[in-house]
Swiss-Prot record:
PANTHER family: ANTIPORTER SUBUNIT MNHG2-RELATED. This is UPF0091 protein PH1428. It comes from the Archaea. Coiled coil: none annotated. Belongs to the UPF0091 family. One of its GO terms (molecular function) is sodium:proton antiporter activity.
């Protein structure tokens, strides 16, 4: 039963990571590509980490070997680091793109540019 849960988590992970890869190729500009890739790969990595944690806790229950608890905790710490750094990195890339003059393809309103102009005046 645990194996099916692990395989389901891995299947969801692979699906979302593939969708993120497709987003990199299909979307028109850096902002939509960044959005698609960041959201999909974050969600995919969450499920991959859940699969590792479930595996480690199942093995811990079977063997009582503390290295599996360590593996589960390290996986959760890595997941926490990803959840903190992935959005920050995406924001930094988007901001750098905007500051370098690469604007969205179909932007109607650019509030960030308007605020920057007001600040400069």
């Amino acid at each position: 039963m645990i194996e099916y849960l692990i395989l389901t988590c891995l299947a969801i992970s692979v699906t979302f990571n593939m969708l993120g890869s497709i987003a990199l190729h299909r979307f028109p500009d850096v902002y939509t590509r960044l959005h698609g890739a960041t959201k999909c790969t974050t969600f995919g990595t969450i499920f991959a980490t859940f699969a590792v944690v479930i595996f480690a806790l199942a093995r811990l229950n079977e063997t009582r070997n503390p290295k599996y608890l360590q593996m589960a905790l390290h996986s959760l710490i890595a997941l926490l680091a990803l959840l903190l750094t992935n959005p920050v990195g995406a924001h930094a890339i988007a901001r750098a793109s905007h500051l370098s003059g690469y604007l969205p393809k179909r932007a109607v309103v650019d509030a960030y540019l308007e605020r920057r102009r007001e600040k400069d005046e």
